Amino acid sequence: MILKSQANKLKFTKQAKVFHYGSISLITEPCRSAHMKATEEAKEAGALLSYDPNLREPLWPSPEEARTQIMSIWDKADIIKVSDVELEFLTRNKTIDDETAMSLWHPNLKLLLVTLGEKGCRYYTKDFHGSVETFHVDAVDTTGAGDSFVGALLNQIVDDQSVLEEEERLRKVLRIANACGAITTTKKGAIPALPTDCEALSFLKRQVEQ
């Protein structure tokens, strides 16, 4: 289905608590304009805007076009998640550290996340930053791991965004998000591999017992 701007008259953008989006719809029109309109409507309605660029470089006309378009809506987001590969691509810096990550910070951002694969994730807010280790599993397919991570995060904060202001609570949320990402890699496919709440909690319980 091709998303067109008039389709944004649908109520979902004005009723959403969270509006999560990527960058692929920015590649061509009419999707680009529809994307921008939907983002604006969700923001005006008070939704939490979550952005995962989800870089697919071969789909773009050029690396420069990808960077330009991805960054064109950067300062709209409340939460941004990038992978270490995306961080390197966007900053042109092969050094994955706090300074490089914070070069992507914008004044209205509430949470910046950098996922590091088997090394876990780093988190940044205006008041604190740190890292959370992930769980070692026998991975068979990493497809969907990032989506699982973000989905678990948003699921836990959608009704209580104060989590973003309290580091210990945020770390607990990210631990569960890391668990969901890890579980997803143990199965083939993206959607079929996404864990339920019960599966994630059972996984965490087993980790404690080991």
From Swiss-Prot:
Pathway: Glycan biosynthesis; starch biosynthesis. PROSITE patterns: PFKB_KINASES_2. It holds the Pfam family PfkB. It catalyses: D-fructose + ATP = D-fructose 6-phosphate + ADP + H(+). InterPro entries: Carboh/pur_kinase_PfkB_CS (IPR002173), PfkB_Carbo_kinase (IPR050306), PfkB_dom (IPR011611), Ribokinase-like (IPR029056). One of its GO terms (cellular component) is cytosol. Keywords: ATP-binding, Carbohydrate metabolism, Kinase, Nucleotide-binding, Transferase. One of its GO terms (biological process) is fructose metabolic process. May play an important role in maintaining the flux of carbon towards starch formation. Belongs to the carbohydrate kinase PfkB family. This is Putative fructokinase-8. It comes from Arabidopsis thaliana.
